[in-house]
């Protein structure tokens, strides 16, 4: 495992300021319950399970009353910062909130809050391959279905070749200074990048694709939640509540006392 070489050397950013409007319901999807715990508990535990992980920065909405106030997971620090109006803004806020010990050329992971089924083997492979590349890498899955191009009338205009198409997953691994530059330049140009690799692409960089498991899915619909609950039951997965540390303060108080004081607005879309 790569963690034996790079133990405690990687920080992760988890953008969690979105409302998950596609899912519906009163709770943001990252706080939906599965197996008695919020989805994000499984997400953070999956990241913290790798020995290379040093800590996690979670970007939350300014009005987030649901954040449990976790300060550590598996004894690894969890910091919080205020997220922005888009996923990209939240990721940038998280990168800027990293501890001073994280250098400009250090690699940083970015992982979706509502992608709780990350396999340790996939994370290990991403770190091993990505850290050997000057740009970085992302987990991805080859497109296996036949793709159709639709016309304005809903009819099929043609079939798209799929041989070189991949679905972008997370985590994604990039150097801190390149994340800052890429996300800042995209924002200045008015471009809403939907993942960090897109920001790298805009700078003419070519991250590597690292094949990951198909079941590293993002929970965006009730069917996705049911699928994850099935996976929990099938594999007998449970979160050790003692591994998630939180102070005895309410969530709203914790949200006000976040690590950075960036002036932002909460998400108005499904940007996590």
Curated annotation (Swiss-Prot):
Q: Which SUPFAM superfamilies match?
A: Nucleotide-diphospho-sugar transferases
HAMAP family in UniProt? IspD
Keywords, alphabetical: Isoprene biosynthesis, Nucleotidyltransferase, Transferase
Q: What does this protein do?
A: Catalyzes the formation of 4-diphosphocytidyl-2-C-methyl-D-erythritol from CTP and 2-C-methyl-D-erythritol 4-phosphate (MEP).
Q: Where is this site: Transition state stabilizer?
A: 22, 29
Enumerate the Gene Ontology biological process terms: isopentenyl diphosphate biosynthetic process, methylerythritol 4-phosphate pathway
Source organism superkingdom: Bacteria
Show the PANTHER family listed in the entry: 2-C-METHYL-D-ERYTHRITOL 4-PHOSPHATE CYTIDYLYLTRANSFERASE, CHLOROPLASTIC
Q: What is this protein called?
A: 2-C-methyl-D-erythritol 4-phosphate cytidylyltransferase
Q: Which reaction does it catalyse?
A: 2-C-methyl-D-erythritol 4-phosphate + CTP + H(+) = 4-CDP-2-C-methyl-D-erythritol + diphosphate
State the organism named in the record. Xanthomonas oryzae pv. oryzae (strain MAFF 311018)
Family statement drawn from the similarity comment of this UniProt entry: Belongs to the IspD/TarI cytidylyltransferase family. IspD subfamily.
Q: Where is this site: Positions MEP for the nucleophilic attack?
A: 162, 218
Enzyme's top EC category: transferase
Q: What is this protein's gene name? A: ispD
Q: List the disulfide bonds.
A: none
| InterPro entries reported in the protein's UniProt record | IspD, IspD/TarI, IspD/TarI_cytidylyltransf_bact, ISPD_synthase_CS, Nucleotide-diphossugar_trans
Q: Which GO terms describe its molecular function?
A: 2-C-methyl-D-erythritol 4-phosphate cytidylyltransferase activity
- Pathway recorded for this protein: Isoprenoid biosynthesis; isopentenyl diphosphate biosynthesis via DXP pathway; isopentenyl diphosphate from 1-deoxy-D-xylulose 5-phosphate: step 2/6
Q: What is its EC number?
A: 2.7.7.60
């Amino acid at each position: 495992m790569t963690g034996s070489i790079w133990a405690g050397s990687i920080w992760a950013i988890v953008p969690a300021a979105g409302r998950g409007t596609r899912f519906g319901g009163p709770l943001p999807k990252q706080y939906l319950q599965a197996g008695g715990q919020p989805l994000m508990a499984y997400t953070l535990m999956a990241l913290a399970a790798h020995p290379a992980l040093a800590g996690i920065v979670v970007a939350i909405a300014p009005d987030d009353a649901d954040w449990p106030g976790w300060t550590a997971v598996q004894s690894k620090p969890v910091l919080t910062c205020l997220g922005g109006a888009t996923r990209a803004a939240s990721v940038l806020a998280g990168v800027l909130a990293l501890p001073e010990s994280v250098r400009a050329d250090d690699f940083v992971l970015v992982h979706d809050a509502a992608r709780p089924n990350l396999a340790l083997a996939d994370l290990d492979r991403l770190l091993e391959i990505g850290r050997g590349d000057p740009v970085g890498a992302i987990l991805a899955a080859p497109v296996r279905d036949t793709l159709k191009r639709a016309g304005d009338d809903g009819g099929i205009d043609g079939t798209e070749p799929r041989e070189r198409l991949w679905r972008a997953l997370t985590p994604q691994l990039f150097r801190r200074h390149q994340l800052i530059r890429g996300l800042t330049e995209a924002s200045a140009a008015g471009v809403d990048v939907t993942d960090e690799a897109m920001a790298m692409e805009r700078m003419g960089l070519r991250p590597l694709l690292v094949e990951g498991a198909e079941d590293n899915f993002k929970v965006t619909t009730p069917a996705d939640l049911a699928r994850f609950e099935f996976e929990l039951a099938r594999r007998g997965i449970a979160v050790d509540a003692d591994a998630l540390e939180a102070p005895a303060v309410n969530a709203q108080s914790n949200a006000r006392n976040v690590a950075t004081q960036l002036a932002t607005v909460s998400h108005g879309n499904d940007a996590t």
